[in-house]
Amino acid sequence: MVSEAPPFWWQKAGWQAWLLSPFSLLYGKVAGRRMRTAKRANVPVPVICIGNFTVGGAGKTPTAIAIARAAVARGMKPGFLSRGYGGTLDVTTLVDAQHHRAAAVGDEPLLLAREAVTVISRRRVEGAHRLVKEGVNLIIMDDGFQSARLTLDYALVVIDTVRGIGNGHLVPGGPVRAPLAEQMRQMTGLLKVGKGHAADPLVRQAAKAAKPVFVAAIMPQEPEDFRGKRVLAFAGIADPAKFYRTVEALGGDIVLSRSFPDHHHFSDDEIDDLLKDARKENLQLVTTAKDAVRLNGHHGRAEELLWNSQVIEIDMVFDDPNAAGTVIETAVVNCRARLLRDNARSST
């Protein structure tokens, strides 16, 4: 997977996208065939996958957390399954938010582990069975829609309404992970995030295919005494511009900004530069929760940077307060039907 999306992916298709179109065509054939023909294993609990059409962030992790909170409110014990992207561990691991570090397990699993049981595994089936062993009765996959090795009881695809699907081309000419027709066929529902219009064509396609469309917004938790502050905003996420818009919406005056690749592990020099620039201009440092978990327990002056940074926490808030419950209930019904079919086949 591409770690840093080139800017032309998110612009109107130009010469770069067309030059790479033969490779995109080949990539699309392979990705589409893999989605259609992949053998998928069953587990005895409902599986919800939170995915997106494109490379990069669209709000999958906060969506997964919102679904988990709704499950807990229903008396369920949800668990998260993540690949652990950005981490070095290649064995199935139960994540401990207090002891593990982002360099080992990835940043998103640490955010998830604050909410519920979280397992990272490059082998999804093995990871799912580990969650079942931990007593989980609802598995929520953060990403993995295009490469699922598990039978999914609900595939919720998240799309950012400002970025949409970028130039609409498949990797490497654009950000799209697999042919849209196949992705649309396999998704259960669509979640549009924000108030932009870049996702409107896909929303219409989903509605035409009788797929439910949910609406949500990322709501930041407003820090105390933040409005009007002069800040240095820094972020190592898929879409730093989205974070900067959030900071401005909260009333922060961004004097300086520093963008880094998604899942970026800060070097000592980068940390020193951020601290120096903030002090020189008398600015409040501000960053994302994902960046904060990468700094926690990191080397050198990372702890100093974290201590001096205002961390903006976010929540995914559905327009319909029953939306998350609807996703969960549908997954439970689909799981029951799946298990009944499996039992019927095994008894014949």
From Swiss-Prot:
UniProt lists the gene as: lpxK
Which keywords has UniProt assigned to this entry? ATP-binding, Kinase, Lipid A biosynthesis, Lipid biosynthesis, Lipid metabolism, Nucleotide-binding, Transferase
According to UniProt, this protein's pathway is: Glycolipid biosynthesis; lipid IV(A) biosynthesis; lipid IV(A) from (3R)-3-hydroxytetradecanoyl-[acyl-carrier-protein] and UDP-N-acetyl-alpha-D-glucosamine: step 6/6
Q: Which GO terms describe its molecular function?
A: ATP binding; tetraacyldisaccharide 4'-kinase activity
- Nucleotide-binding among the record's keywords? yes
Q: What is this protein called?
A: Tetraacyldisaccharide 4'-kinase
Q: Does the keyword Protein biosynthesis apply?
A: no
Quote any Pfam family the record assigns: LpxK
Q: Name one GO cellular component term.
A: plasma membrane
Summarizing the function annotation, the protein's role is:
Transfers the gamma-phosphate of ATP to the 4'-position of a tetraacyldisaccharide 1-phosphate intermediate (termed DS-1-P) to form tetraacyldisaccharide 1,4'-bis-phosphate (lipid IVA).
Q: Where does ATP bind?
A: 54-61
What does the record give as EC number? Answer: 2.7.1.130
This enzyme catalyses: a lipid A disaccharide + ATP = a lipid IVA + ADP + H(+)
**Which protein family is named in the record?**
Belongs to the LpxK family.
Q: Which GO terms describe its biological process?
A: lipid A biosynthetic process; lipopolysaccharide core region biosynthetic process
- InterPro entries given for it? LpxK, P-loop_NTPase
NCBIfam families from the UniProt entry: lpxK
In terms of SUPFAM superfamilies, this protein maps to:
P-loop containing nucleoside triphosphate hydrolases (SSF52540)
